[in-house]
Amino acid sequence: MRPRVFQESCLALARLVPSFLLASCVLLLIDNFTYTVFGFGIRKTDGTIRYFYAFLYLALLGFSYRYIWIIERQKAKGRVLRLSGAALPALSVLFVIFRFLSLAGGSIAQTAETAPLKNSPNIIIISTDGLNADHLPMYGYYRNTTPFLQEFSKTALLFENAFTNAGNSGSSIASMMTGKLPTATRLIYPPDILRGKDAYQHLPAILRRLGYRSIDISIRHFVDPFDLNMRNSYDRANFREIREDKLIEYMAKYFGQDTAYFIDNTLERIESRLLHAYGISSMSDAYEEAVGDGQKKYHNDDERIEELLAFIDASTAPFFAHVHLMGTHGPKFSPKQRKYSSGQAQSVNWMVDFYDDAILDFNRYMKKIVENMRGNAVLDNTIIVIHTDHGRLWKTLLRVPLIIRFPKGRYAGRFEQNAQYLDIAPTLLDYLGIEKPDWMCGQSLLSSQISPHRRIITIRMKSKVAEVIDGLWQINQAKVKPPFFHLGFVGVIICHRWYELDLTKKVLRYSEIKGHTSPCKEGDSPDPEEIERFIVDHLKINQWDVSSLKLPLDKIYIKPAR
């Protein structure tokens, strides 16, 4: 009798696991449906209203438990049902046990770490969103928007003509870290992620194997390394400790990364909804985190800087930090001190005076970081990279800031030849004395072999793919279709000229880069026909379907702005 009671008790407990999974998935489906169709869901609730979903979940859990119990009661009808009735709870229990054990361990894909390099310098890569070089005094701007950085840059290597490789934060940061073009990784815009080898081939993984402690302080959903599926990358990311999940890694190995990422992402979404419904923590909103009042509600730049300083203070081993600030992200700005916008109301989007005040905020943050490092005596053993993700209004065919301060001011000066963000990782590895992997496309900017005529590729997503409709941030699925999906524009920069192919309208536009300080001689730039063939060949090499691009295409010369 007792063995049977014990068996029934074990089965009763085992039923809770599949019941939890079933109830959670149903809750997720309901929430996604109501939010998409009617504009309300768990995230929109607060106070006592959120407990409606808590009670709903309990009801779903009870229904699921009874449903599984009914299935199990029917096992007498056949051997298959008998086996499935026993196997489902057993497998569920094993799933939970294995998941907890996997969280306690490391990643199966992680290469064994080596000893740190002798006298390894610390590395900080810090960016602020949507920053134009032509709004900085060291690039010729008439306002002194960055008084501290202007002096600081005199001890650094400043790149006068630097360019991003992508017009959106995620694709820009991912290409910088991987050293691969977005056209190769297919990471253009969410929900695009790194896949296959791309998920493991990047600068953070290399530094981690060299013994670096690492942290990413950016923004969830858009730049977060694990939202981008950048595996084996950081020890801590966006205010949470990161432990690679062995179960997810095994699933990626045997069932494919798309399946593993989907399951991992689904479990995280379920967790965030349940924590919100039961009042444990608030659920974030991807759109609100990036714009408007959401920057105040969620982790703001003050919190990001404090997180960085705490990480630096606690570090004993060499550290690597990537920080992405959001104060200069439009279309509206919330500067802490208003010098240029004093007395004005921010009545329209993208007001220049408010933008310049936001840049002043970034300057103050940089001063705080550098002074803290100087006080901790780590400044002269740290490489500091200052850049942005793209230009204001997500532009790519203009100069963006790039300043690299090496330990003790080594290599200080101004670099006139064209640079791209794909060059950042190879440059850092070169300084460390590490050979650049074959999969990195950029060049070390410490090399004297950079041709002024090399072709820099940059991309932008299709226009109006992401829009705010009826107060909700949505992807216009009608525009995300084959053969180019999110990809809308492919640009090429050579010397002081830019060319950009509009993949939707099948038009090639070209012009000169405003403010370029090292133009090539007349006749050194290729003609538009050569560039359109180059772009089409580049897409073809990277397995894009280019059958819709019938050459020659229409061409439009754009008169440069003055």
Indicate where each model-derived feature is located:
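Alpha-helical transmembrane segments of polytopic membrane proteins
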Residues: 1, 45-60
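Membrane-interface soluble catalytic domains
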Residues: 1-40, 63-70, 85-115, 205, ...
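His/Cys-centered metal/cofactor-coordination and adjacent catalytic loops
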Residues: 118-121, 132-245, 251-252
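Short beta-strand segments
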Residues: 127, 163, 216-218, 319-327, ...
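Metal-dependent active-site segment of extracytoplasmic phospho-/sulfohydrolases and closely related
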Residues: 148, 357-398, 402-403, 408-409, ...
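Formylglycine-dependent
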Residues: 221, 227-312
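Active-site His/acidic residue clusters
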Residues: 278-290, 306-357, 393-400, 405
